[in-house]
């Protein structure tokens, strides 16, 4: 691996891209009002002083602001990519040059380099891990068990990662507590529902220049991401079709006014397909074979296993690359979850935890403050009524 010319150990495309990255980071920061508030508190209180953090996240301008916030809270932070395709090389360069944050990420890096970068991040001997898909935690528990002793806790950002970590906890192999940031109500609201919904539509349109109005838009999965995507696709004029394996979510989709059917049925009808399930083989060779000529297939889940890419490769007569892009959202829950883990790790078990309700509500309150919105508070009389049982109708 190559390293940058700075003394800070990193592996990036090159520091010559840092000027553009610096502008991107500053631009993203303007719209991250909640993180700005948290960063000011972190600078003042230094809650992460002495902590080493290894973060395996999308290396984007938004994530850069999270890393800067953690550093300003006293942490020693290194960052590696959770997805080789999402890395913004200019942002990585600016983090190294301008913010003294170690980065191991190069856009489009091959599989070997990707995992070598995770190993390099673990050489940092972290006290806290931050993950987006649980690859770093998995490597730590399998190939780098020597680095486990100093770890006091971690956070996980995605549904896919939380599923993997809960499986590890169930088997008794998870060696430290993890806060599932993905399960926070504010994360569902800002990131999964509204963030993923908008950014997925934006990505499809930017890549294809396809007119959604009047098209049949098939969405596999009606979780938080699927709901947000369905809402945005309908808003763009598409006829939305939902496929699901969970009867409750399928019923919810139907009651929300969407057509619900199996993927086998939907494959024959759709103009655009998007998988948001967190599972594998959602769109298979059999589905692809019956799709319309020119159908658009996309995935907004974390890994690329939801679509049978190997089968698609074999069926394709040629390939052509179009434009690349990515958007990321809200990191307030991540930063506060790290602070929570540092303060409470000694009392936590080796399992996956939800974000504490008081922390989640704090993020919501900070967001409302940043928007200039005020809400009512319960009166003492109302609090007493809610807590009691003797007063009836």
Predicted regions span which residues?
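ADP-ribose/adenylate-binding Rossmann-like module
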Residues: 81, 128-133, 144-160, 279, ...
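Short acidic, glycine/serine/threonine-rich loops at helix termini
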Residues: 66, 90-92, 116-117, 138-145, ...
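Glycine-rich phosphate/diphosphate-binding loop of Rossmann-like nucleotide-binding domains
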Residues: 57-75, 187, 191, 195-280
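Glycine/serine-rich phosphate-binding loop and adjoining beta1-alpha1 elements at the start
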Residues: 2-48, 79-215
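Redox-cofactor binding/interface segments in oxidoreductases and associated redox assembly factors
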Residues: 17, 55, 130-131, 274-275, ...
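Structural alpha-helical scaffold elements that stabilize or flank donor/cofactor-binding regions
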Residues: 121-122, 265-266, 290
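Active-site cofactor/substrate anionic-group-binding motifs, chiefly glycine-
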Residues: 52, 67-86
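Adenosine-phosphate binding glycine-rich loop
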Residues: 2-9, 17-34, 48-52, 56, ...
């Amino acid at each position: 691996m190559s390293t940058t010319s700075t003394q800070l150990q990193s592996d990036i495309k090159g520091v010559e891209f840092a000027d553009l990255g610096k502008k991107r980071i500053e631009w993203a920061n303007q719209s991250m009002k909640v993180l700005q508030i948290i960063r000011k508190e972190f600078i003042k209180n230094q809650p992460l002083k002495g902590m080493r953090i290894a973060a395996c996240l999308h290396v984007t301008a938004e994530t850069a602001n999270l890393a800067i916030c953690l550093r300003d809270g006293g942490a020693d932070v290194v960052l590696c990519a959770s997805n080789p395709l999402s890395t913004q090389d200019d942002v990585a360069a600016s983090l190294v040059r301008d913010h003294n944050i170690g980065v191991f990420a190069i856009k489009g890096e091959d599989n070997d380099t990707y995992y070598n970068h995770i190993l390099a991040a673990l050489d940092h001997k972290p006290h806290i891990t931050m993950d987006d898909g649980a690859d770093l935690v998995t490597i730590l528990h399998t190939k780098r068990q020597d680095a486990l002793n100093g770890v006091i806790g971690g956070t996980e950002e995605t549904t896919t990662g939380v599923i993997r970590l809960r499986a590890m906890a169930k088997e008794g192999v998870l060696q430290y507590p993890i806060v599932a940031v993905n399960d926070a109500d504010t994360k569902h609201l800002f990131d999964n529902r509204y963030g993923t919904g908008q950014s997925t539509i934006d990505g499809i349109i930017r890549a294809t220049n396809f007119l959604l109005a009047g098209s049949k838009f098939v969405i596999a999965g009606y979780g938080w991401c699927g709901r947000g995507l369905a809402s945005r696709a309908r808003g763009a004029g598409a006829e939305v079709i939902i496929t699901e394996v969970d009867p409750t979510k399928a019923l919810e989709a139907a009651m929300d006014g969407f057509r619900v059917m199996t993927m086998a049925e939907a494959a024959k009808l759709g103009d655009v397909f998007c998988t948001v399930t967190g599972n594998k083989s959602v769109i298979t060779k059999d589905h692809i074979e019956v799709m319309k000529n020119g159908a658009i297939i996309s995935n907004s889940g974390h890994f690329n296993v939801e679509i049978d890419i190997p089968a698609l490769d074999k069926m394709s007569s040629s390939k052509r690359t179009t434009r690349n892009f990515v958007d990321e959202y809200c990191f307030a829950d991540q930063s506060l979850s790290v602070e929570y883990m540092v303060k409470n790790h000694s009392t936590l078990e080796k399992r996956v935890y939800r974000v504490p309700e008081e922390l989640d509500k704090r993020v919501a309150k900070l967001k409302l403050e940043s928007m200039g919105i005020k809400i009512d508070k319960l009166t003492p009389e109302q609090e007493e009524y809610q807590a009691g049982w003797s007063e009836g109708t």
